[in-house]
Amino acid sequence: MEVERVQAIASLSHSNGTIPAEFIRPEKEQPASTTYHGPAPEIPTIDLDDPVQDRLVRSIAEASREWGIFQVTNHGIPSDLICKLQAVGKEFFELPQEEKEVYSRPADAKDVQGYGTKLQKEVEGKKSWVDHLFHRVWPPSSINYRFWPKNPPSYRAVNEEYAKYMREVVDKLFTYLSLGLGVEGGVLKEAAGGDDIEYMLKINYYPPCPRPDLALGVVAHTDLSALTVLVPNEVPGLQVFKDDRWIDAKYIPNALVIHIGDQIEILSNGKYKAVLHRTTVNKDKTRMSWPVFLEPPADTVVGPLPQLVDDENPPKYKAKKFKDYSYCKLNKLPQ
Protein backbone atom coordinates (compact mmCIF):
# COMPACT_ATOMS: atom_id res chain seq x y z
CA MET A 1 0.00 0.00 0.00
CA GLU A 2 1.34 3.36 -1.03
CA VAL A 3 1.11 5.76 1.91
CA GLU A 4 0.89 9.45 1.20
CA ARG A 5 3.37 11.33 3.36
CA VAL A 6 2.50 14.69 4.89
CA GLN A 7 5.69 16.14 3.39
CA ALA A 8 4.28 15.41 -0.10
CA ILE A 9 0.80 16.68 0.82
CA ALA A 10 2.39 19.89 2.15
CA SER A 11 4.11 20.56 -1.19
CA LEU A 12 0.79 20.27 -3.04
CA SER A 13 -1.12 22.24 -0.41
CA HIS A 14 1.41 25.03 -0.53
CA SER A 15 0.66 25.69 -4.19
CA ASN A 16 -3.12 25.92 -3.74
CA GLY A 17 -3.28 27.38 -0.22
CA THR A 18 -5.68 24.77 1.18
CA ILE A 19 -5.34 21.53 3.13
CA PRO A 20 -7.24 18.24 2.71
CA ALA A 21 -10.38 17.97 4.84
CA GLU A 22 -9.01 15.13 7.00
CA PHE A 23 -6.41 17.55 8.42
CA ILE A 24 -8.96 20.19 9.48
CA ARG A 25 -9.57 19.81 13.21
CA PRO A 26 -13.00 20.16 14.82
CA GLU A 27 -13.52 23.73 15.99
CA LYS A 28 -12.99 22.83 19.66
CA GLU A 29 -9.41 21.76 18.74
CA GLN A 30 -8.46 24.41 16.19
CA PRO A 31 -5.40 26.38 17.32
CA ALA A 32 -6.85 29.67 16.05
CA SER A 33 -9.77 29.50 18.47
CA THR A 34 -8.21 27.60 21.39
CA THR A 35 -4.73 29.11 21.92
CA TYR A 36 -4.55 31.52 24.84
CA HIS A 37 -2.68 34.73 24.00
CA GLY A 38 -3.02 36.66 27.26
CA PRO A 39 -0.39 36.90 30.00
CA ALA A 40 0.35 33.37 31.17
CA PRO A 41 2.89 31.76 33.46
CA GLU A 42 5.91 30.21 31.73
CA ILE A 43 6.88 26.56 31.89
CA PRO A 44 9.48 26.31 34.69
CA THR A 45 13.13 26.42 33.62
CA ILE A 46 15.56 24.62 35.93
CA ASP A 47 19.37 24.82 36.08
CA LEU A 48 20.47 21.19 36.33
CA ASP A 49 23.88 22.33 37.52
CA ASP A 50 22.49 24.06 40.63
CA PRO A 51 25.05 23.32 43.40
CA VAL A 52 22.31 23.28 46.06
CA GLN A 53 20.76 19.83 45.63
CA ASP A 54 17.81 20.45 47.95
CA ARG A 55 16.77 23.45 45.88
CA LEU A 56 17.12 21.45 42.65
CA VAL A 57 15.04 18.56 44.00
CA ARG A 58 12.37 21.00 45.23
CA SER A 59 12.20 22.82 41.87
CA ILE A 60 11.88 19.60 39.87
CA ALA A 61 9.27 18.11 42.24
CA GLU A 62 7.21 21.31 42.19
CA ALA A 63 7.33 21.56 38.38
CA SER A 64 6.34 17.88 38.10
CA ARG A 65 3.40 18.33 40.47
CA GLU A 66 2.12 21.64 39.11
CA TRP A 67 2.97 21.37 35.41
CA GLY A 68 4.19 17.89 34.46
CA ILE A 69 6.74 19.61 32.25
CA PHE A 70 9.88 21.71 32.69
CA GLN A 71 12.92 22.81 30.72
CA VAL A 72 16.47 22.12 31.90
CA THR A 73 19.60 24.14 31.15
CA ASN A 74 23.25 23.31 31.98
CA HIS A 75 22.40 19.64 31.50
CA GLY A 76 25.83 18.59 30.29
CA ILE A 77 24.98 17.67 26.68
CA PRO A 78 27.34 19.75 24.49
CA SER A 79 25.49 22.32 22.38
CA ASP A 80 27.46 21.31 19.27
CA LEU A 81 26.23 17.72 19.72
CA ILE A 82 22.62 18.97 19.87
CA CYS A 83 23.28 20.94 16.65
CA LYS A 84 24.67 17.79 15.00
CA LEU A 85 21.67 15.73 16.15
CA GLN A 86 19.37 18.30 14.55
CA ALA A 87 21.46 18.55 11.38
CA VAL A 88 21.56 14.80 10.64
CA GLY A 89 17.84 14.43 11.35
CA LYS A 90 17.00 17.33 9.04
CA GLU A 91 19.24 15.88 6.33
CA PHE A 92 17.40 12.57 6.52
CA PHE A 93 14.02 14.23 5.99
CA GLU A 94 15.42 16.20 3.04
CA LEU A 95 16.49 13.00 1.22
CA PRO A 96 14.54 11.91 -1.88
CA GLN A 97 11.27 10.21 -0.91
CA GLU A 98 12.27 6.77 -2.21
CA GLU A 99 15.42 6.84 -0.07
CA LYS A 100 13.38 7.58 3.07
CA GLU A 101 10.90 4.81 2.24
CA VAL A 102 13.71 2.24 2.62
CA TYR A 103 13.31 2.81 6.39
CA SER A 104 9.52 2.73 6.44
CA ARG A 105 7.78 0.78 9.16
CA PRO A 106 6.60 -2.59 7.85
CA ALA A 107 2.80 -2.65 7.49
CA ASP A 108 2.43 -5.74 9.70
CA ALA A 109 4.90 -4.58 12.38
CA LYS A 110 3.88 -4.76 16.04
CA ASP A 111 6.59 -2.21 16.83
CA VAL A 112 6.55 1.51 16.01
CA GLN A 113 10.14 1.64 14.75
CA GLY A 114 10.72 3.06 11.28
CA TYR A 115 9.85 5.98 9.04
CA GLY A 116 6.19 6.78 8.72
CA THR A 117 3.06 8.81 9.00
CA LYS A 118 0.45 8.08 11.63
CA LEU A 119 -1.51 5.36 9.91
CA GLN A 120 -4.44 4.89 12.23
CA LYS A 121 -6.88 7.75 11.92
CA GLU A 122 -8.11 9.31 15.11
CA VAL A 123 -11.58 8.77 16.52
CA GLU A 124 -13.17 11.40 14.26
CA GLY A 125 -11.20 10.29 11.19
CA LYS A 126 -8.75 13.18 11.43
CA LYS A 127 -5.04 13.18 10.64
CA SER A 128 -2.04 14.99 12.13
CA TRP A 129 0.28 17.21 10.06
CA VAL A 130 3.49 15.26 10.74
CA ASP A 131 5.81 12.56 9.42
CA HIS A 132 8.18 10.74 11.77
CA LEU A 133 11.08 8.37 12.26
CA PHE A 134 11.23 6.08 15.31
CA HIS A 135 14.17 3.96 16.46
CA ARG A 136 15.58 2.82 19.79
CA VAL A 137 18.97 4.24 20.79
CA TRP A 138 19.56 2.33 24.07
CA PRO A 139 20.17 -0.29 25.46
CA PRO A 140 22.25 -2.01 22.76
CA SER A 141 20.14 -5.18 23.01
CA SER A 142 17.03 -3.20 21.93
CA ILE A 143 18.59 -1.48 18.90
CA ASN A 144 17.65 -2.48 15.36
CA TYR A 145 19.99 -0.68 12.96
CA ARG A 146 17.71 -1.50 10.03
CA PHE A 147 15.75 1.62 11.02
CA TRP A 148 18.79 3.91 11.42
CA PRO A 149 19.42 6.00 8.30
CA LYS A 150 22.68 5.29 6.46
CA ASN A 151 22.50 8.80 5.05
CA PRO A 152 23.81 11.18 6.14
CA PRO A 153 26.86 8.97 6.92
CA SER A 154 27.40 10.57 10.35
CA TYR A 155 23.83 9.78 11.49
CA ARG A 156 24.77 6.69 13.51
CA ALA A 157 27.81 8.14 15.28
CA VAL A 158 25.93 11.33 16.25
CA ASN A 159 22.93 9.43 17.63
CA GLU A 160 25.11 6.99 19.58
CA GLU A 161 27.03 9.85 21.15
CA TYR A 162 23.78 11.66 21.99
CA ALA A 163 22.42 8.50 23.67
CA LYS A 164 25.58 8.27 25.78
CA TYR A 165 25.17 11.81 27.15
CA MET A 166 21.41 11.38 27.46
CA ARG A 167 21.83 8.48 29.89
CA GLU A 168 23.70 10.70 32.35
CA VAL A 169 20.96 13.35 32.23
CA VAL A 170 18.25 10.72 32.64
CA ASP A 171 19.92 9.19 35.70
CA LYS A 172 20.04 12.63 37.35
CA LEU A 173 16.39 13.31 36.55
CA PHE A 174 15.23 9.96 37.95
CA THR A 175 17.28 10.57 41.12
CA TYR A 176 15.88 14.06 41.74
CA LEU A 177 12.32 12.94 40.96
CA SER A 178 12.68 10.07 43.46
CA LEU A 179 14.06 12.34 46.18
CA GLY A 180 11.19 14.76 45.51
CA LEU A 181 8.77 11.97 46.44
CA GLY A 182 10.62 11.32 49.69
CA VAL A 183 12.01 7.95 48.56
CA GLU A 184 15.61 6.95 47.93
CA GLY A 185 17.29 8.24 44.78
CA GLY A 186 17.35 4.95 42.86
CA VAL A 187 13.73 3.96 43.42
CA LEU A 188 11.92 5.44 40.39
CA LYS A 189 14.49 4.31 37.84
CA GLU A 190 14.49 0.79 39.25
CA ALA A 191 10.68 0.64 39.22
CA ALA A 192 10.59 1.85 35.60
CA GLY A 193 12.94 -0.92 34.42
CA GLY A 194 16.38 -0.02 35.78
CA ASP A 195 19.20 -0.43 33.27
CA ASP A 196 16.78 -2.11 30.85
CA ILE A 197 14.72 1.07 30.33
CA GLU A 198 14.37 1.55 26.57
CA TYR A 199 15.29 4.86 24.96
CA MET A 200 13.01 5.35 21.94
CA LEU A 201 14.02 8.30 19.78
CA LYS A 202 11.40 9.90 17.56
CA ILE A 203 12.04 12.61 15.02
CA ASN A 204 8.91 14.64 14.29
CA TYR A 205 8.87 16.51 10.98
CA TYR A 206 6.09 19.10 10.66
CA PRO A 207 6.26 20.67 7.16
CA PRO A 208 4.95 24.20 6.50
CA CYS A 209 1.14 24.21 6.52
CA PRO A 210 -0.93 26.79 4.58
CA ARG A 211 -3.66 26.67 7.26
CA PRO A 212 -1.92 26.45 10.65
CA ASP A 213 -5.08 27.94 12.19
CA LEU A 214 -7.02 24.76 11.36
CA ALA A 215 -4.50 21.89 11.66
CA LEU A 216 -2.47 20.27 14.44
CA GLY A 217 0.93 18.58 14.22
CA VAL A 218 0.05 16.29 17.11
CA VAL A 219 -3.32 16.16 18.82
CA ALA A 220 -3.64 16.67 22.61
CA HIS A 221 -2.18 13.71 24.51
CA THR A 222 -0.05 12.61 27.45
CA ASP A 223 3.03 10.47 26.73
CA LEU A 224 2.80 6.79 27.64
CA SER A 225 6.49 6.82 28.59
CA ALA A 226 7.95 7.22 32.08
CA LEU A 227 9.79 10.38 31.03
CA THR A 228 10.28 12.14 27.70
CA VAL A 229 13.38 14.24 27.01
CA LEU A 230 12.87 16.49 23.99
CA VAL A 231 15.03 18.73 21.83
CA PRO A 232 13.00 21.14 19.64
CA ASN A 233 14.19 23.22 16.71
CA GLU A 234 13.76 27.00 16.82
CA VAL A 235 10.25 26.99 15.30
CA PRO A 236 7.71 27.23 18.14
CA GLY A 237 4.79 24.82 18.29
CA LEU A 238 4.67 22.96 21.60
CA GLN A 239 1.60 23.89 23.65
CA VAL A 240 0.73 22.83 27.19
CA PHE A 241 -2.73 22.63 28.76
CA LYS A 242 -2.55 24.54 32.03
CA ASP A 243 -5.33 26.17 34.06
CA ASP A 244 -7.90 25.10 31.45
CA ARG A 245 -6.17 26.76 28.51
CA TRP A 246 -3.55 26.07 25.84
CA ILE A 247 -0.38 28.09 26.26
CA ASP A 248 2.74 28.23 24.11
CA ALA A 249 6.04 26.83 25.37
CA LYS A 250 8.89 29.29 25.02
CA TYR A 251 11.85 28.14 22.94
CA ILE A 252 15.12 28.25 24.90
CA PRO A 253 18.18 27.43 22.77
CA ASN A 254 20.01 24.28 23.94
CA ALA A 255 17.51 23.56 26.73
CA LEU A 256 15.95 20.11 27.04
CA VAL A 257 12.18 19.89 27.49
CA ILE A 258 11.24 17.23 30.06
CA HIS A 259 7.74 15.69 30.03
CA ILE A 260 6.42 13.63 32.90
CA GLY A 261 4.82 10.61 31.22
CA ASP A 262 2.02 8.29 32.29
CA GLN A 263 4.32 5.74 33.96
CA ILE A 264 5.83 8.29 36.38
CA GLU A 265 2.35 9.57 37.17
CA ILE A 266 1.35 5.99 38.02
CA LEU A 267 4.52 5.21 40.02
CA SER A 268 4.10 8.45 42.01
CA ASN A 269 0.42 7.55 42.65
CA GLY A 270 -0.64 10.81 41.02
CA LYS A 271 1.72 13.13 42.91
CA TYR A 272 3.50 13.94 39.64
CA LYS A 273 1.25 14.72 36.68
CA ALA A 274 1.71 13.56 33.08
CA VAL A 275 1.53 16.71 30.96
CA LEU A 276 -1.30 17.17 28.46
CA HIS A 277 0.29 18.74 25.39
CA ARG A 278 -0.11 19.18 21.64
CA THR A 279 1.81 20.61 18.70
CA THR A 280 0.80 23.41 16.35
CA VAL A 281 2.31 23.98 12.91
CA ASN A 282 3.75 26.96 11.04
CA LYS A 283 2.71 28.53 7.75
CA ASP A 284 6.21 29.19 6.42
CA LYS A 285 8.67 27.10 8.40
CA THR A 286 9.32 23.45 9.12
CA ARG A 287 9.13 22.56 12.80
CA MET A 288 11.09 19.54 14.00
CA SER A 289 11.55 17.91 17.39
CA TRP A 290 13.58 15.03 18.79
CA PRO A 291 11.84 13.43 21.78
CA VAL A 292 13.42 10.42 23.49
CA PHE A 293 10.74 8.35 25.23
CA LEU A 294 12.03 6.44 28.25
CA GLU A 295 9.91 3.32 28.34
CA PRO A 296 9.84 0.33 30.68
CA PRO A 297 10.55 -3.04 29.01
CA ALA A 298 7.32 -4.64 27.73
CA ASP A 299 6.85 -7.11 30.61
CA THR A 300 7.69 -4.69 33.44
CA VAL A 301 4.74 -4.33 35.81
CA VAL A 302 4.17 -0.66 36.67
CA GLY A 303 1.98 0.39 39.58
CA PRO A 304 2.07 2.93 42.43
CA LEU A 305 5.26 2.66 44.51
CA PRO A 306 4.48 0.73 47.73
CA GLN A 307 6.30 3.45 49.73
CA LEU A 308 3.63 5.97 48.64
CA VAL A 309 0.56 3.86 49.39
CA ASP A 310 -1.16 3.43 52.77
CA ASP A 311 -4.65 3.53 54.28
CA GLU A 312 -4.87 7.28 53.80
CA ASN A 313 -3.35 7.16 50.31
CA PRO A 314 -4.84 4.15 48.53
CA PRO A 315 -3.52 3.26 45.06
CA LYS A 316 -5.14 5.42 42.35
CA TYR A 317 -3.95 3.24 39.46
CA LYS A 318 -3.95 -0.45 38.60
CA ALA A 319 -0.57 -2.19 38.36
CA LYS A 320 -0.13 -3.65 34.89
CA LYS A 321 2.49 -4.72 32.39
CA PHE A 322 3.77 -1.84 30.29
CA LYS A 323 2.86 -3.68 27.07
CA ASP A 324 -0.75 -4.03 28.25
CA TYR A 325 -0.90 -0.36 29.25
CA SER A 326 0.49 0.63 25.83
CA TYR A 327 -1.98 -1.59 23.98
CA CYS A 328 -4.94 -0.05 25.81
CA LYS A 329 -3.69 3.49 25.29
CA LEU A 330 -2.88 3.12 21.60
CA ASN A 331 -6.22 1.42 20.93
CA LYS A 332 -8.14 3.95 23.04
CA LEU A 333 -9.37 1.28 25.46
CA PRO A 334 -10.00 1.97 29.16
CA GLN A 335 -7.07 1.16 31.47
From Swiss-Prot:
Q: Which reactions is this enzyme annotated as catalysing?
A: a (2R,3R)-dihydroflavonol + 2-oxoglutarate + O2 = a flavonol + succinate + CO2 + H2O; a (2S)-flavan-4-one + 2-oxoglutarate + O2 = a (2R,3R)-dihydroflavonol + succinate + CO2
InterPro entries named among the record's database cross-references:
DIOX_N, IPNS-like_FE2OG_OXY, IPNS-like_sf, Iron_ascorbate_oxido_reductase, Oxoglu/Fe-dep_dioxygenase_dom
Membrane-spanning segments: none
Q: Where in the cell is it found?
A: Cytoplasm
Record flagged with keyword Cell membrane = no
Q: What role does this protein play?
A: Catalyzes the formation of flavonols from dihydroflavonols. It can act on dihydrokaempferol to produce kaempferol, on dihydroquercetin to produce quercitin and on dihydromyricetin to produce myricetin.
Q: What is this protein called?
A: Flavonol synthase/flavanone 3-hydroxylase
Organism, as annotated: Citrus unshiu (Satsuma mandarin)
Gene transcribed to yield this protein: FLS
